[in-house]
Amino acid sequence: MQSYIAVNIDMASLKMLICVCVAILIPSTLSQDSHGIGWNNSPHDTASMDVGKISFSEAIGSGAPKEPQIRNRIFACSSPTGASVARLAQPRHCHRHADSTNMTEGIAVVFKQNIAPYVFNVTLYYKHITTVTTWALFSRPQITNEYVTRVPIDYHEIVRIDRSGECSSKATYHKNFMFFEAYDNDEAEKKLPLVPSLLRSTVSKAFHTTNFTKRHQTLGYRTSTSVDCVVEYLQARSVYPYDYFGMATGDTVEISPFYTKNTTGPRRHSVYRDYRFLEIANYQVRDLETGQIRPPKKRNFLTDEQFTIGWDAMEEKESVCTLSKWIEVPEAVRVSYKNSYHFSLKDMTMTFSSGKQPFNISRLHLAECVPTIASEAIDGIFARKYSSTHVRSGDIEYYLGSGGFLIAFQKLMSHGLAEMYLEEAQRQNHLPRGRERRQAAGRRTASLQSGPQGDRITTHSSATFAMLQFAYDKIQAHVNELIGNLLEAWCELQNRQLIVWHEMKKLNPNSLMTSLFGQPVSARLLGDIVAVSKCIEIPIENIRMQDSMRVPGDPTMCYTRPVLIFRYSSSPESQFSANSTENHNLGILGQLGEHNEILQGRNLIEPCMINHRRYFLLGENYLLYEDYTFVRQVNASEIEEVSTFINLNATILEDLDFVPVEVYTREELRDTGTLNYDDVVRYQNIYNKRFRDIDTVIRGDRGDAIFRAIADFFGNTLGEVGKALGTVVMTAAAAVISTVSGIASFLSNPFAALAIGIAVVVSIILGLLAFKYVMNLKSNPVQVLFPGAVPPAGTPPRPSRRYYKDEEEVEEDSDEDDRILATRVLKGLELLHKDEQKARRQKARFSAFAKNMRNLFRRKPRTKEDDYPLLEYPSWAEESEDE
């Protein structure tokens, strides 16, 4: 609501005020609640109407000229009888605007959103394996192949590293469902000390065991392996909501730094299997640089595909905070406005606006540090500056300011004011009640974001709006103080002018009361009050002006005002005239008064003057009389108008709260580039490890899902029997898959291919030898079975006995050879007989077994013949068959 006051005052009194008011262009509120006198326009009043009460602004409001014009209305006024009286108001107390401002002094601590990442120390354990193949031919070696990889170190070896500072030269690792071993320089395993690396930075230190690899030999190919055990001290960084962290090496670990298995609340984020994560209590770590053993702490270990990482276990609420202290303000002022508080920070030239309800800080997630930090800062400021002059008033209050700033405010009260307050409370026999603190439940701002674990304050990146708020508040305070002074001066001026009006009512009460009421009235002074009667409007056609202003019968006397004859109209208003209604058509003698008023009677006379020239207002125009005779009618526009009216439109500046306008959010600024570094690094690390889950290799699907689905089908449809059958199916499938996987792995090995090639060549050679033996057996079985029994072809015949001198000796030698040959033949026949007999028995047993199995599957009933045992094959029958 806006109210304006326009009052006609003299030029000299407001010459200074004009210059000030021209500069004030901001609209606000100004109301004046003056009380005065006015009409009670009831149609049941008498001819002289009683005066009721109207406001002073209503009385003088009609005097503000919208456009300079003269009303074409004429009124007839009767002499007041005293039935309606009025009085002028007394001077009033002038209010000062500055007295209404409620200010509270105190100490403020301003918090902002903590956008800094959480930084903590980690230790990286891994073995760097390098396999190099070189070629040399009595010349400089050439590298033909190189393979580099990193493998994690198991927990038991990490314990040895942290205790003794030594690491093994052997690396055992698992890749593609197989275990591998690597040895440094292809030598036997040994313990090597960890020595500092020359490559260091402010955020990382490294220790390793070797930097030398035997890469070549003088002649031929050489494949050499080096195993370097590396331990790195790094800084890791994690940002809210702390679901992963990154290291200076560029590696990212997809687990929260606050992850723990033993927790009662919701578990933190992790994509690793439980067996990869270890929590060790009272673990001691040796500083490899100084050799000192650190105090025991709870230690976390995580085994990744390429490294093992260790860090100290931490409590999330004790380690991180979503808010951080921005500034401390020893002299802060809280100004109370209609709907908000303004916290003015004079030293920082900033002002923050907030709601009037304190903010419930327990709603914030990970903001337990705020009360502690605020209390420590306020205690320090109070002890240094206010302990001897002020006392604290109430507890620390928190307010959420515009732009996402949390304000901790401690109210202060001077010793003198506090003593007066206590004395007043004791006098009233009760202690002062503190203002009830209400929580701002449900109050939402653009700076407060809700989450599953609690709310979080997001702070605007710029505080320019707070500086603008401070500037506006300073200008507002200055302008409002100036306007307050103007209003006070205006009030005092009205009081002084009221004294003048009291004196004017004694001289010309008609003009005074007409100007106050804004309409023609007739007034007469009755002691200290004024009798007032209302004037009746006379239509201009009911008025007849006379041309001469001379008094009939006396040539020396003339009328000072033009004379006229008028009559009241037949309108309902005529009933309020002094004449009766039945005489309304009779002419009434009168004179033209000031401001289009008709004076009943012709009592205003004066001695006639020479060169008389007068202008009298009638309706909208003026009547010109010269030598007391009407000359002509003059238009009002022909006469230059001089106005002394000055408008005073004093407006107080409104309360205005500046809010931050963020053109580009942080997310938009972060996404302005083509690539997002965090997303690229995380994707690259995940792609290099080739996992969907950290332990599920993409190419490691062996078809288990199909057989598992079959087993579930049996279990769901056949019940317990189906579950047992499904277990059998899964077992058989696992055996088949393992066999096939083993064969596939064997065939994929290059040594297996070489072994298979050698086996094929050996088999071919053995086959050719067997084929040659069979062909020789078919062509000459006696020679093959009994070598030497028959002389080979081309052997000269044995000489006859006649060529020998000693015939008896020759005959004896021949008989001996025959006996030896016969013995060999008999032994060979005996062996053949035994082999045939053995084969016949095996055949008979197999036939009986096959017959029994057929009867068993066919469920053939037993007969009496089946109860008799088979007769054994007699030995004499076998001998007869042989014969």
Swiss-Prot record:
PTM note: A proteolytic cleavage by host furin generates two subunits that remain linked by disulfide bonds.
Keywords, comma-separated and alphabetical: Disulfide bond, Glycoprotein, Host cell membrane, Host endosome, Host Golgi apparatus, Host membrane, Host-virus interaction, Membrane, Signal, Transmembrane, Transmembrane helix, Viral attachment to host cell, Viral envelope protein, Virion, Virus entry into host cell
Source organism superkingdom: Viruses
Chain intervals for the UniProt region annotation (Disordered): 428-457, 791-817
Tagged with keyword Glycoprotein: yes
Disulfide topology: 77-535, 94-491, 167-229, 321-369, 558-608
BP GO terms, sorted: symbiont entry into host cell; virion attachment to host cell
Principal location class: virion
Residues with glycosylation annotation: 102, 121, 211, 262, 360, 579, 635, 649
Physiological role: Envelope glycoprotein that forms spikes at the surface of virion envelope. Essential for the initial attachment to heparan sulfate moieties of the host cell surface proteoglycans. Involved in fusion of viral and cellular membranes leading to virus entry into the host cell. Following initial binding to its host receptors, membrane fusion is mediated by the fusion machinery composed at least of gB and the heterodimer gH/gL. May be involved in the fusion between the virion envelope and the outer nuclear membrane during virion egress.
HAMAP family, sorted: HSV_GB (MF_04032)
Subunit structure and binding partners: Homotrimer; disulfide-linked. Binds to heparan sulfate proteoglycans. Interacts with gH/gL heterodimer.
This protein's name: Envelope glycoprotein B
Species this chain originates from: Infectious laryngotracheitis virus (strain SA-2)
